[in-house]
Amino acid sequence: MDTEMSVNMSDFLHDQATRAPESLQQSYILMEDLYERKLWKQLTDALIVFFDTPETVPLRLPLYTNFVNSFRPNINQLKAVYMGLKAFESCSNDEALRNLNQIVNELDEEKYKDAYVYSIVAIARIKLISGKLDEARELLVKASKIIDHIDYVESLIHSSYYSVSADYYKAKADYAQYYRHCLLYLSCIDLDKCSHTELVERAVDLSVAAILGDIYNFGELLLHPVFELLVGTQHEWLHDLVIAMNVGDLPLFERLMGQINKMPLLQSSVALLGQKIRLMALIELVFQLPPNQRTLTFDTIARATRIPSNEVELLIMRALSVGLITGVIDEVTQIVTISSVQSRILNHSQIASMESRLREWNQNIKNLSNVVEISGKGVFV
């Protein structure tokens, strides 16, 4: 029986090789050799290389269906599912969904948790593409619970989960969650293997999410290599807008209003953006002051944030409510005393400013030390 199966598989591989470009024919010879010797790990590795080759797209489905499936129980199940997903790229969404459901039904969830969760995340992606957001969400929640109970999670699984989750939150216009999951996705993948176009699209989406979401610390985005890919493109103004938002740069924000109004998503939220950048301007104002000089008048804040004095208290209360600052407002004297500012990742100019303040503080300590030394001479003699 094994000999007959081997002969049949040999004929199949020879037939497939004749349909393949000359550059790929050697791969089929290698597959046949490894299959006949039952070197499953080496065969799996060779197949992964084959399935990862862009030119093999039309050749993958018959190879997976007729060849890989014949020995699938003998190989790593996560890699088997990976090859299946690569093969289904040439299928319609409905056909891919049927194939994936069959894989899920055949997998032992407890024994092969990694392969199982990878499969249901792939199903969630198709549900999402088909507009079935609730079904996609249910699968993602289920996947998250399984991932939490896997001792070691392959980056392949994490990247897939975060990618689909990010797309889900984008579809739901949940900007803060999209921002978080997209950054997690990017941390799981090799950026060098992504196309420039894909990374620029991610940078655009991340920038919009950072601007519109309930996000007040832009450090992770500013320091991420994809963010700089916006420079030199038609989206460079978004790069500048994020920088303006980060430091509360109102003049730059106002110069970018023409571009903002060209993007409907931002144009419809201009009032929100105005409030957010004024919050950041307030934070920047406080940050620039020494901790012992953070008592501000409403008029000072009004000038820095370019709002009427009678709107300052509302701005401060908003900053307090979202945790950007802690402090006490004196409504009678129209003064606010700031006790702390939310920690943040600093840009180069902010680091330079902090260095200057540290030098000033160090000098003050030296001066105080000299005063104590001179004043105490008579006491310690």
UniProtKB/Swiss-Prot annotation:
Q: Name one Pfam family in it.
A: PCI
Q: Which protein are we looking at?
A: Probable 26S proteasome regulatory subunit rpn9
UniProt GO MF annotations: structural molecule activity
The chain positions of domain PCI read 177-343
The reply to whether Cytoplasm figures as a keyword in the UniProt entry is no
Q: Which SMART domains match?
A: PINT
Top-rank taxon, per record: Eukaryota
Q: Which InterPro entries match?
A: PCI_dom (IPR000717), PSD13_N (IPR054179), PSMD13 (IPR035298), Rpn9_C (IPR040798), WH_DNA-bd_sf (IPR036390)
GO terms, biological process = proteasome-mediated ubiquitin-dependent protein catabolic process; ubiquitin-dependent protein catabolic process
* UniProt KW Signal keyword: no
Q: Which UniProt keywords apply?
A: Proteasome
GO CC terms of this entry: cytosol; nucleus; proteasome regulatory particle, lid subcomplex
- Which protein family is named in the record? Belongs to the proteasome subunit S11 family.
Q: Which PANTHER family match?
A: 26S PROTEASOME NON-ATPASE REGULATORY SUBUNIT 13
Lineage, opening ranks: Eukaryota, Fungi, Dikarya, Ascomycota, Taphrinomycotina
* Job of this protein: Acts as a regulatory subunit of the 26S proteasome which is involved in the ATP-dependent degradation of ubiquitinated proteins.
